[in-house]
Amino acid sequence: MAVQTLKDLLDAGVEGRTVLVRSDLNVPLDGGEITDPGRIVASAPTLRALAEGGAKVIVTAHLGRPDGQPDPKFSLAPVAAKLAEILGRNVQLAGDVVGQDALARSEGLTDGDVLMLENIRFDPRETSKDEAERVKLAKALVELVGDDGAFVSDGFGVVHRKQASVFDVAKLLPHYAGYLVGAEVEVLAKLTQDAARPYAVVLGGSKVSDKLAVIEALAPKVDTLVIGGGMFYTFLAAQGVSVGNSLCEESMIETCKGLLDRYADVIHIPQDVVVADSFSADAESKIVPFDKIPDGWMGLDIGPESVKRFAAILTGAKTVFWNGPMGVFEFPKFEAGTRGVAEAIVEATEKGAFSVVGGGDSAAAVRQLGIPDEGFSHISTGGGASLEYLEGKELPGIAVLEG
């Protein structure tokens, strides 16, 4: 990665300098409580290194989709509190993004202080398609930092977005890749350029349309592509099988037919499914062969025979990439498929395989199921960004660091 890194910045000395850090702190909340602090934990090393080096650290991040205006339920207050706990030092929270409070607090910072700006997406310019609007916000962020400031990009989950705090601000300040962004790119480069064989990919999630580009990109390059989750039922429909009330993207059926024809030796789909009579945690359920889904029932997980088959593939692999759960893991009755796949990947890792969990719902599933992060070589913090990287797309937030 031909970019300046956080190590370069620290080696040059940060004492007394103000450093703006774009972190990815977009964690799940339930009633204001953080249910999975994984992204905050992953962001802490960069922030800790800067603060301990004597920098005045200003953190910018988003939470949820607040529609370009302040919304109390998307305040970063619980995130700032959790970050303070993890860092073991005070984290101030500004009452605005680049307004009077943010400016006053930034001017009052002393060496080693950490200031978090309020949710950057409270400002509509952050995600504007109008470059001039984004640049105005980027300049306001630079004003908080001052003339000898620096920018550290450490929010891997947003580097595929051309947004003010990710892309435009990097053009206005000396810019560096944080520890997290550097590690993520290194891992993904290994998956694309240096993967040990056999190479197995597991894709789940609800929609084929969300994963089509990555299927097209990876199918010619891997040994096995395992398909599960809600999108599997569109592949079933492509084989002329009735899927009952299961999720199915009618518009993608022909595309799935083409994929199954072209990559018959590579694509593996479940042979049995766990079906339910309704979408609920306490629905009546049963295990049926893939071609015997009853009318009015829906598939909510892969079945035990499929778990066995997939586990045999995965435990024999030397490289594994997993993105997307196998079923509705949030309901205990339908978590077994996702758990079985996760445990098989852990076993492969114990045997020496290089395993990557591709962020998003997969990372949430791993943690909800109580499987230690250490069971995998790497858990990505960026679902969409990791997929776009594997698709071969340019990531604006990385490209600008290379410029």
UniProtKB/Swiss-Prot annotation:
The keyword Oxidoreductase does not apply. ATP binds at residues 211, 299, 330, 359-362. The keyword Secreted does not apply. One of its GO terms (cellular component) is cytosol. Pathway: Carbohydrate degradation; glycolysis; pyruvate from D-glyceraldehyde 3-phosphate: step 2/5. One of its GO terms (molecular function) is phosphoglycerate kinase activity. It comes from the Bacteria. CDD domains: Phosphoglycerate_kinase (cd00318). Pfam families: PGK. It catalyses: (2R)-3-phosphoglycerate + ATP = (2R)-3-phospho-glyceroyl phosphate + ADP. Keywords: ATP-binding, Cytoplasm, Glycolysis, Kinase, Nucleotide-binding, Transferase. Its EC number is 2.7.2.3. Disulfide bonds: none annotated. It is an enzyme of class 2 (transferase). Substrate binds at residues 24-26, 39, 62-65, 121, 161. Belongs to the phosphoglycerate kinase family. Monomer. This is Phosphoglycerate kinase. It comes from Rhodococcus erythropolis (strain PR4 / NBRC 100887). The gene is pgk.
